[in-house]
Amino acid sequence: MHISRLALDHYRSWDHCVLDFEPGINILQGSNGLGKTNIVEAVEVLSTGSSHRTSSSLPLVEKGHPSATVRANVEDAGEQRTYEITIAARGANRARVDGGKSQYMRDIVGWVPSVSFTPEDQRLVSGDPATRRNFLNQAASLLLPRYAQSLQQFTHVAKQRAALLKQLSDGSGIDPEYGRQAVLSGLEVWTGQFIALGVQLTKDRNDVIGLLREPFTRIYASLAGEEEQADLVYEPSFDEVLLFDEPAAEISRHFQRIYPGEVARGQNLIGPQRDDLTLRLNDMPAREFASNGEMWTMALALKMALYEVVSAQRDVKPIVILDDVFAQLDESRRGQILDFARRQDQVLITVAAASDIPQGEAHVIDVAALRAQSQETDGDIAAMAAMLAAGRGAQSQGIEAES
């Protein structure tokens, strides 16, 4: 599988952009600030339904525009399909396949699988739990067809439940006629949905970690040395899911115990939104004891493990994205990731300096030239629009004169 053409409209810093890719290694080279990371991020969003750089759609849309569009011609097994997503600054994101009917973007998540390696990957080990939850969500979205929809539903339910807790906390928005009892009745309904969806997300995440654990341990040992033992440990907020065959009743009782604290704080105190994933090295938490080099290697092994699992589960090689990673890695790790990349169907690499371009055959894209071409196209479009407007104005004046 590979992307042959990518087109962006109003995506971050790109007003309009069209570029062609080749199978194998593609290198986007240009100085910082030209928008090369935005290009590969657009592929990530098309693939996983989200970006590792932001949890909101708003930053993905060029300022002053209501939406951004990403289109990709994708070739796989001799067939070509066109995938299009429309990212709304406000509201639901939509998608089309081959110009067909509009559907939710979540419905095509994972159809063009990709795995990204970025300078922020070390934060998968050293960063906060939200970084690791984002990784879990992207991984599960690639591996489990229903996951993206379940996550979106859970996020909506969690917001509704939190809003009711806040009302109970500060008394705001409580109807004077029906009062507190109506809010409590609503809270009971939303809590039931919160538990049901949360249990499913927890099971899905546990399944995904189960798939990743063996290849992660094996790949880390091959990168760092056989004597090193790395492991993944899931730490779900709903730990009842792993302890009981029927966890919903136990979780409901848990909510009853913490109800005063939730009302006092006005927020959901337990649930998948508080999950974590611990990476352990030699039976110790890596974020506390591993060196920077070991953290980089663990993050690299985790992404390679995800690639291996997605490839096996989907029977297709995901597109590999290497976003500005060569400047961050030492010579040994750079060689390891290059060896991995050269075996894939398509790799998109961003580099700032020509000296960072890896040796070997590659399709190199000059991002500065691409930016100049994009601006020239924008100017032509603006000039054409002005001419059309002037023509309409002259035509209107002529009609008025005749009358």
Swiss-Prot record:
GO biological process, one term: DNA synthesis involved in DNA repair
Organism in which the protein naturally occurs: Bifidobacterium adolescentis (strain ATCC 15703 / DSM 20083 / NCTC 11814 / E194a)
Gene that specifies this protein: recF
Keyword Cytoplasm on entry: yes
SUPFAM superfamilies, alphabetized: P-loop containing nucleoside triphosphate hydrolases (SSF52540)
DNA repair in keyword set: yes
Gene Ontology CC entries for this record: cytoplasm
Major site of localization recorded for this protein: cytoplasm
Keywords from the named record: ATP-binding, Cytoplasm, DNA damage, DNA repair, DNA replication, DNA-binding, Nucleotide-binding, SOS response
Pfam family for this entry, one: SMC_N
Protein role: The RecF protein is involved in DNA metabolism; it is required for DNA replication and normal SOS inducibility. RecF binds preferentially to single-stranded, linear DNA. It also seems to bind ATP.
Protein name per its UniProtKB record: DNA replication and repair protein RecF
Signal sequence range: none
Binding site residues for ATP: G30, S31, N32, G33, L34, G35, K36, T37
Molecular-function annotations in GO: ATP binding; single-stranded DNA binding
Compartment annotation: Cytoplasm
Protein family (similarity comment): Belongs to the RecF family.
